[in-house]
Amino acid sequence: MASGSGPGAAASANLNAVRETMDVLLEISRILNTGLDMETLSICVRLCEQGINPEALSSVIKELRKGTEALKAAENTS
């Protein structure tokens, strides 16, 4: 087989495409000031790929952030 062909090359090209896609999504996320890091964004993408409704996922993330902020505020006033 010539170099750059075969299953290994295809897997490598696919991995590079996935990385590039995630980099673009992370940049969009930063532009939109979502506060999501690469790991969290990756989890969200996988959940959406599994059929989770993106709007519902967004609502859950917002509610979790509100809860976290409320807990932090309560700790600061104690």
From Swiss-Prot:
GO annotation terms (biological process): gamma-tubulin complex localization
Alphabetical UniProt keywords: Acetylation, Cytoplasm, Cytoskeleton
Compartmental location: Cytoplasm, Cytoskeleton, Microtubule organizing center, Centrosome; Cytoplasm, Cytoskeleton, Spindle
Any Pfam family hit: MOZART1
InterPro entries: MZT1 (IPR022214)
One cellular component term from this protein's GO annotations in UniProt: spindle
Modified residues (N-acetylalanine): 2
Complex and partners: Associates with the gamma-tubulin ring complex (gTuRC) consisting of TUBGCP2, TUBGCP3, TUBGCP4, TUBGCP5 and TUBGCP6 and gamma-tubulin TUBG1 or TUBG2; within the complex, interacts with TUBGCP3 and TUBGCP6 to form a luminal bridge with actin that stabilizes the initial structure during complex assembly. Interacts with TUBG1.
Family statement drawn from the similarity comment of this UniProt entry: Belongs to the MOZART1 family.
Function: Required for the recruitment and the assembly of the gamma-tubulin ring complex (gTuRC) at the centrosome. The gTuRC regulates the minus-end nucleation of alpha-beta tubulin heterodimers that grow into microtubule protafilaments, a critical step in centrosome duplication and spindle formation.
Protein name: Mitotic-spindle organizing protein 1
Organism: Mus musculus
UniProt lineage: Eukaryota, Metazoa, Chordata, Craniata, Vertebrata
